[in-house]
Swiss-Prot record:
Underlying gene: CLDN23
The organism of origin for this protein: Homo sapiens
GO cellular component terms, semicolon-separated: bicellular tight junction; plasma membrane
GO MF entries: identical protein binding; structural molecule activity
Location of region: Disordered: 222-292
Identification of the protein by name: Claudin-23
GO biological process: bicellular tight junction assembly; calcium-independent cell-cell adhesion via plasma membrane cell-adhesion molecules; cell adhesion
Length: 292
């Protein structure tokens, strides 16, 4: 059996989301701070969840900077740490379940396990999207996320973008894998419809079972009683007339008997006065009326 499309799509999107979330969690690039007083114009400070890095003209990058404003103690940073780590752990668990559920090395996948992995991956995407959105909401609030006063400016950095992308990919991949529940639910519904009832109802009226003799059915009815249009066997078929081969031969016309003697001679009006055969002998070879 070929791997369903929803499973293949989920198995592609989920690892990509895991990689992006892992990079966004570890990289010090959630917020970009620049425009410091009494420092070169090109000095920039990248703040992350675990570290700060100072960069100047893209040539020198120094990490492990001292937190002078209490940035790491801010509530959005602490919550983001916990939720991002939880999201990564849930993603790993979901991928493990998906690998066991899809089972590309076997013919039939495990739809229940694949659907469960989709639910876990979807939850992992939510756990990654919540801290990223919350951090972005308070990005410019210096009371919540401490930062130097103006003219210092704060901007969104690349780690937030990676977090958004990774979380969205996990949501899509988890939803795609969760669609694997559809064949399993369909099969269960079919089993319930085809399953036997709880038990036969007991009738209050006593019934009498009468066995009627089965009538002898004709051979044609026996073969057509199942509702299928099947031809009867050869012994019950009527023999078809054989086609005539050739052409009819001409037959001679029947010959009729002809007599050259006029049998009506002497029966006309002219012969009424003539003497009959009884008075004088008949010259004709035919018998006379008196002889009849």
């Amino acid at each position: 059996m070929r791997t369903p499309v929803v499973m293949t799509l989920g198995m592609v999107l989920a690892p990509c989301g895991l990689l992006l979330n892992l990079t966004g969690t570890l990289a010090p690039g959630w917020r970009l701070v620049k425009g410091f007083l009494n420092q070169p114009v090109d000095v920039e400070l990248y703040q992350g969840l675990w570290d700060m890095c100072r960069e100047q003209s893209s040539r020198e990058r120094e990490c492990g900077q001292t937190d002078q404003w209490g940035y790491f103690e801010a509530q959005p940073v602490l919550v983001a740490r916990a939720l991002m780590v939880t999201s990564l752990a849930a993603t790993v668990l979901g991928l493990l379940l998906a690998s066991l559920g899809v089972r590309c090395w076997q013919d039939e996948p495990n739809f229940v396990l694949a659907g469960l992995s989709g639910v876990v991956l979807f939850v992992a995407g939510l756990l990654g999207l919540i801290p990223v959105s919350w951090y972005n909401h308070f990005l410019g609030d210096r009371d919540v996320l401490p930062a130097p006063a103006s003219p210092v400016t704060v901007q969104v950095s690349y780690s937030l973008v990676l977090g958004y992308l990774g979380s969205c990919l996990l949501l899509l991949g988890g939803f795609s894998l969760a669609l694997s529940f559809a064949p399993w639910c369909d099969e269960r519904c079919r089993r319930r419809r085809k399953g036997p009832s709880a038990g036969p109802r007991r009738s209050s009226v006593s019934t009498i079972q009468v066995e009627w003799p089965e009538p002898d059915l004709a051979p044609a009815i026996k073969y057509y009683s199942d509702g299928q249009h099947r031809p009867p066997p050869a012994q019950h078929r009527k023999p078809k007339p054989k086609p005539k081969v050739g052409f009819p031969m001409p037959r001679p016309r029947p010959k009729a008997y002809t007599n050259s003697v006029d049998v009506l001679d002497g029966e006309g009006w002219e012969s009424q006065d003539a003497p009959s055969c009884s008075t004088h002998p008949c010259d004709s070879s035919l018998p006379c009326d008196s002889d009849l």
